[in-house]
């Protein structure tokens, strides 16, 4: 079993490598239409913020076990995206991995914590095991786990389209955001499933920058549905 360590030094002394998995904000969210596969086409601006989970990873060369511990009791190992990411990367390789995640991004907050964890695990295993997969191939693997994972693998602020996997770099001024967490957990998938589109909407023009005065017009199409589900 994977044990708990008291601090970063103990992890590092035990042979782990530390990684940071950042959260993201959706500066707006426009739902365009629902696809035949059940996903929704959308437009958004994904903005990385400095709220981060700490992830400690150590490759197991002696067996193929995938062991994962999460500081949040809300997440079962078998349903953890980080576990699924490790399994995806190590299938057909005679290797295992120990992963410990110190959660700082609130669960069910819409900040992309699970997707970010999965992205970091994918990139870390690629580096530690010297698989030398390209970023494009890593993004393709990440998309199998969730629509937001490619964004975190890409690692830069982006104008997002498709189901969130079509990314265009965007320049954003150095804004300060106050992120308030009301101690509520919302299932993003359930919110999308419950969302009722009244009609297909016309897409916005792709932007390469985001200005301060545009904050007055930002809107989240899922906001009303979220409050209905609280």
Residue locations for each model-derived region?
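DPxDG-like acidic metal-binding loop motif
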Residues: 109-135, 139, 151
């Amino acid at each position: 079993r994977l044990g708990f360590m008291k601090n970063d030094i103990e992890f590092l002394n035990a042979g782990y490598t530390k990684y940071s998995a950042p959260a993201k904000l959706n500066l707006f969210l426009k739902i365009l239409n629902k696809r035949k596969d059940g996903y929704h086409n959308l437009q958004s601006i994904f903005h990385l913020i400095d709220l981060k989970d700490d992830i400690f990873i150590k490759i197991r060369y002696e067996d193929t076990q995938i062991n994962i511990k999460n500081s949040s009791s809300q997440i079962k190992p078998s349903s953890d995206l980080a576990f699924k990411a490790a399994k995806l990367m190590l299938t057909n390789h005679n290797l295992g991995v120990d992963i410990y995640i110190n959660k700082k991004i609130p669960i069910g907050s819409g900040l992309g914590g699970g997707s970010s964890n999965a992205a970091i695990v994918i990139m870390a295993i690629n580096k530690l095991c010297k698989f030398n997969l390209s970023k494009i191939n890593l993004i393709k693997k990440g998309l199998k786990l969730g629509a937001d994972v490619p964004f975190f693998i890409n690692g830069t602020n982006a104008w997002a389209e498709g189901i969130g996997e079509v990314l265009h770099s965007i320049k954003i001024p150095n804004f300060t955001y106050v992120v308030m967490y009301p101690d509520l957990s919302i299932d993003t998938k359930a919110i999308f499933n419950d969302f009722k589109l009244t009609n297909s909407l016309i897409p916005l023009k792709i932007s390469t920058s985001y200005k301060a005065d545009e904050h007055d017009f930002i809107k989240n199409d899922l906001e009303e549905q979220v409050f209905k589900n609280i």
